[in-house]
């Protein structure tokens, strides 16, 4: 899970609470090893080079550390809060850096993220789940990930200022729609990842 919250560790992340409440539990109950990474804890340079620290513009770039985690994963879930109806600025930076690696090819000559499964989990206290999911899932597909059915899940409160997911009385953790969709997401990711793994990924023919 790439939790693109704006909150650095150890501050509370409502998005991370949703991750842990449902999808992570489903994965781990079925033998899938998981890891939650907060990109905001790292120095992620702007740009599309593999390592921006090799350019004159940036003295430090932690993105290669995160890219190693992505490379090792079969399933990558971009998780974000909603701000002004959009995914977080951290999520945008993450997707930009992932896009910068599309020129790296696997042994079939495909973009190196072929054969990986992508999905998204979103929280907020305003509208925007479907809008954010539309952008994130397209971006993952364009980069080379395979997106399963119902690969988005999330929770938002009532319109206007109000409690966030993990706040007392929000109703978020008890929301049947959120819990159902998070469960569908986890299972569909596992099923598709297994299908891809068993069949050697996406055929290179054509």
Q: Which stretches of residues belong to each language-model region?
A:
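Conserved catalytic loop of SAM-dependent methyltransferase domains
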Residues: 43, 47, 156-161
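N-terminal beta1-alpha1-beta2 submodule of the flavodoxin-like/Rossmannoid cofactor-binding fold
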Residues: 1-108, 169-206
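Amphipathic, positively biased hydrophobic alpha-helical segments used for protein targeting
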Residues: 15, 129, 135, 155, ...
